[in-house]
């Protein structure tokens, strides 16, 4: 039996501002943007070259969902962006104005730094040791 995680829902404030951030600042690919109703869209983005898992940008509806925007994991790192060249991507992200909240450091498993997305969700940029 083969299984994999296809999508991870990320609650956002606005579809278009989230698409702009992920495609322009992080250079993700917009995979799909399909209207489902007048207020709901099916929006998928993923890092270039990613084939199995993507982010489903889900607009927060109602007070409870909107209260989670930017803090879906209670202040813990939420997502992990793996790279094949840490320093290349770190410099590119700095040039794009990405805010790093923890500076790069070398760990037993590789090189890592923590950054925020446009809403404040925490991500690891990580290059694992071979």
What are these regions (language model features)?
Residues 1-6, 29-82, 90-118, 126-130:
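Vicinal oxygen chelate
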Residues 12-15, 36-38:
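Conserved beta-strand-loop-alpha-helix junction that forms the acyl-donor binding cleft
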Residues 14, 117-120:
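Conserved phosphate-binding and hydrolysis motifs of nucleotide-dependent enzymes
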Residues 14-15, 84-87:
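Helix N-cap motif at beta-to-alpha junctions
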Residues 18-23, 93, 120:
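Conserved active-site tyrosine of GNAT-family acetyltransferases
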